[in-house]
């Protein structure tokens, strides 16, 4: 066993003394059992994580029952909704790297035989997956689950995205103060990740198709008995996988990454999943070309439109058959998935999901009646984004295939929000927000406030927004993010000027500023070099080491320093 490194031999008597002091070893034979880490992310200020202490206790009991010894440790967590719109958002994406580093540190320092990961919200899930790829110790994931959708006094279904858009609607005067406060009180009624197909739930669904979690991980409610039983079953399966030495890198292959993007296309997931899945591929040693994502989009139908793109919540998806029903439907179209891959269940993706039929065709459409013949995400290329950009086409009004309007440029999120709120931004604009990428932000903050204000003011079909920053999973509208290279790295988005004509072509997947190359070249000659905004602390180190969005925004030490 891997843990023999810390518990076998006379020279490890001091380590054994410390292990006895933890109280985790209940009998003399316990030292001969596998040691299992429970990597938890319980935190009081994140509603998606307030219940995870209880879930960890269930996991501990089941791990003991299965014949192993559990040891729990905790990671940090950032609630993107609470951190939104201020300096706190600069820490959100960088927290992913801290989580990965922290988990790697504890797992490798103590030579655990296996790891039971309990994530839930936006950066915690991918951070833990990065750690699993890095350490490559037998592992299983069981998330905390989504919250119930809210309900307004008028019977309208609510999610957190409803609340963000309500801010713009209230400023516009289209809803009353009473309605506004009612929504605030009822948008998030229980613990769990936010109820729509936002980043947290997107990643928790993708873990099912990646093969790292049990079926229904992405949709079973946080408050359900099914969630608690899933924790128990996952614990039993992990101990079995430790004995069989089934490791994360055996499961997460290039084909698994393909299938993760295919499910994302079918469910119209968050654009952040592109960033995180590319980072996972990078950590797994898989060279993954962005063009591959568009090829997947072309062959994958869009089957389930979930909030913020509709009024359906994750619970509605669960009742309609969950991710297994979507996977089963996709498997009926040859070449869409790679169903004979091994998963954490010890069975193939096909064996896990075959025969799981759709129970509600309004929530999950069948292959012969998709929302769209192609997937809900697209990678755009062009002279603004030579290394790619991402748009959630599933969140764009279906009537819009191309959009050509005049640029109005801002060098920060805050400048753009002020201009939208004071009506400087009008119908016919393409809002350009730059110097908000991984280096520029720093931390690639989410642009939910400006996109929500645009939609809330009724301009969702008349104003586009492009940025080297990123979006919340709650974003909808004509919103292009992750533009690479970013402005801080000298990317062409830095060369756009007010009044330039910009074309977003969703059919041909292009993003261009309609200026001759010689004009752009002259502008580049006068471009002021970027200077880091933060000089001290973690964000300064992050700025120095982070890469562009097209590689997942991972931190890499320059080769000349290794």
Swiss-Prot record:
Binds 1 [2Fe-2S] cluster per subunit. This cluster acts as a Lewis acid cofactor. Keywords: 2Fe-2S, Amino-acid biosynthesis, Branched-chain amino acid biosynthesis, Iron, Iron-sulfur, Lyase, Magnesium, Metal-binding. [2Fe-2S] cluster binds at residues 121, 194. It comes from the Bacteria. The active site is at 472 (proton acceptor). One of its GO terms (cellular component) is cytosol. Disulfide bonds: none annotated. GO terms for molecular function: 2 iron, 2 sulfur cluster binding; dihydroxy-acid dehydratase activity; magnesium ion binding. It catalyses: (2R)-2,3-dihydroxy-3-methylbutanoate = 3-methyl-2-oxobutanoate + H2O; (2R,3R)-2,3-dihydroxy-3-methylpentanoate = (S)-3-methyl-2-oxopentanoate + H2O. Pfam families: ILV_EDD_C, ILVD_EDD_N. One of its GO terms (biological process) is isoleucine biosynthetic process. Pathway: Amino-acid biosynthesis; L-isoleucine biosynthesis; L-isoleucine from 2-oxobutanoate: step 3/4; Amino-acid biosynthesis; L-valine biosynthesis; L-valine from pyruvate: step 3/4. InterPro entries: Dihydro-acid_dehy_C (IPR042096), DihydroxyA_deHydtase (IPR004404), DiOHA_6PGluconate_deHydtase_CS (IPR020558), ILV_EDD_C (IPR056740), ILV_EDD_N (IPR000581), IlvD/EDD_N (IPR037237). Gene3D superfamilies: IlvD/EDD C-terminal domain-like (3.50.30.80). Belongs to the IlvD/Edd family. Functions in the biosynthesis of branched-chain amino acids. Catalyzes the dehydration of (2R,3R)-2,3-dihydroxy-3-methylpentanoate (2,3-dihydroxy-3-methylvalerate) into 2-oxo-3-methylpentanoate (2-oxo-3-methylvalerate) and of (2R)-2,3-dihydroxy-3-methylbutanoate (2,3-dihydroxyisovalerate) into 2-oxo-3-methylbutanoate (2-oxoisovalerate), the penultimate precursor to L-isoleucine and L-valine, respectively. Homodimer. This is Dihydroxy-acid dehydratase. It comes from Staphylococcus aureus (strain Newman).
């Amino acid at each position: 066993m891997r843990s023999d490194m810390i518990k076998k031999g006379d020279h490890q008597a001091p380590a054994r003394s410390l292990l006895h002091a933890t109280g985790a070893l209940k009998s003399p034979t316990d030292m001969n059992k596998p040691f299992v880490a429970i990597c938890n992310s319980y935190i009081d200020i994140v509603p998606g994580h307030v219940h995870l202490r209880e879930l960890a206790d269930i996991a501990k009991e089941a791990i003991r029952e299965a014949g192993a010894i559990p040891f729990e440790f905790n990671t940090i967590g950032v609630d993107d909704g609470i951190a939104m719109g201020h300096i706190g958002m600069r820490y959100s994406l960088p927290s992913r790297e801290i989580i990965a580093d922290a988990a790697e540190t504890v797992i490798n320092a103590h030579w655990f035989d296996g790891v039971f990961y309990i994530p839930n919200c936006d950066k915690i899930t991918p951070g833990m997956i990065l750690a699993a790829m890095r350490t490559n110790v037998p592992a299983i994931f069981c998330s905390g689950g989504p919250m119930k959708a809210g309900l307004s006094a008028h019977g309208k279904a609510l999610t957190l995205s409803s609340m963000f858009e309500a801010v713009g609607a209230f400023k516009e005067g289209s809803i009353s103060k009473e309605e506004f406060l009612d929504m605030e009180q009822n948008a998030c009624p229980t613990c769990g990740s936010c109820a729509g197909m936002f980043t947290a739930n997107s990643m928790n669904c993708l873990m099912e198709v990646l093969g790292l979690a049990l079926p229904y991980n992405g949709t079973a409610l946080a408050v359900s008995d099914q969630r608690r039983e899933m924790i128990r079953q996952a614990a039993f399966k992990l101990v079995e996988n430790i004995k069989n030495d089934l490791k994360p890198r055996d499961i997460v292959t290039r084909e698994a990454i393909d299938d993760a993007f295919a499910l994302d296309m079918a469910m119209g997931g968050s654009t952040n999943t592109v960033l995180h899945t590319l980072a996972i591929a990078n950590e797994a040693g898989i060279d993954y070309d962005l063009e591959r994502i568009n090829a997947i989009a072309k062959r994958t139908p869009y089957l389930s439109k979930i909030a913020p793109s509709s009024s359906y919540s994750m619970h509605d998806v669960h009742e309609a058959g969950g991710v297994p029903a979507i996977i089963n439907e996709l498997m009926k179209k040859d070449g869409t998935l790679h169903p004979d891959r091994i998963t954490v269940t010890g069975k193939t993706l096909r064996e896990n999901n075959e025969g799981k039929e759709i129970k509600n065709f309004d929530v999950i459409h069948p292959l012969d009646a998709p929302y769209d013949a192609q997937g809900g995400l697209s990678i755009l290329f062009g002279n603004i984004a030579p290394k790619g950009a991402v748009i959630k086409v599933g969140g764009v009004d279906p009537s819009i295939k191309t959009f050509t309007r005049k640029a109005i440029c801002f060098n920060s999120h805050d400048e753009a929000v002020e201009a939208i709120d004071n009506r400087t931004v009008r119908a016919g604009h393409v809002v350009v927000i730059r110097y908000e990428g991984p280096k520029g932000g720093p931390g690639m903050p989410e642009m939910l406030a400006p996109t929500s204000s645009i939609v809330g003011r009724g301009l969702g079909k008349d104003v586009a927004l492009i940025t080297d920053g990123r979006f919340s999973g709650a974003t909808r509208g004509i919103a292009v993010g992750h533009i690479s290279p970013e402005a801080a790295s000298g990317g062409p988005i830095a060369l756009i000027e007010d009044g330039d004509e910009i074309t977003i072509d969703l059919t041909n997947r292009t993003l261009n500023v309609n200026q001759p190359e010689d004009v752009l070249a002259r502008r580049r000659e006068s471009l002021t070099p970027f200077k880091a905004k933060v000089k001290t602390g973690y964000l300064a180190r992050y700025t120095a080491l982070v890469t562009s969005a097209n590689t997942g925004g991972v931190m890499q030490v320059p080769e000349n320093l290794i």
